[in-house]
Amino acid sequence: MIGSKVLLCYFLLSIGLVQIDAAPSDKCKTVFSSRVKDSLCGAKEYMTIQEADMDKMMDCVLRAVNIVDNTGAGNLKSLLEPMREIEVDGWKHKLNIESCTTTTMTKTLPEPQRAHAFYKCIMKTKSKKTFKEEFNKRVCGHGSAMNFFTP
């Protein structure tokens, strides 16, 4: 009896997790094709992808993996610890994330453009390599983080 209840709870929990996982990728499918994903994941520096609406794509993708917050600004709480695990220089990363999440950027740009602006900014800092490694873990499936965006 207890075993069947445990099994039922496990089953219901796993269905809930699958639904949570499915939401971001389904939401971003129209702006994040596998071709666009390959271009973005393979990039070593900031580049514009011609066939993508960069603002819409970055807004959707970066929100889905919690790299930016609900306003489109860089999410320091979500990024700092994972970036410190990759490279210990936490002060550099904190400063760079904060400088790319300035009030000027988050208040003057329209909300749908903020995530793209954050990505573009952080990819021009000394934290670029570490950020890109964390980005690739979350978005591209490189590393141990969950990949929301399998084509």
Residue ranges and their predicted role:
Residues 21-151:
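Mature soluble extracellular domains of secreted precursor proteins
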Residues 3-22:
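Cleavable N-terminal signal peptides of Sec/SRP-targeted secreted and luminal proteins
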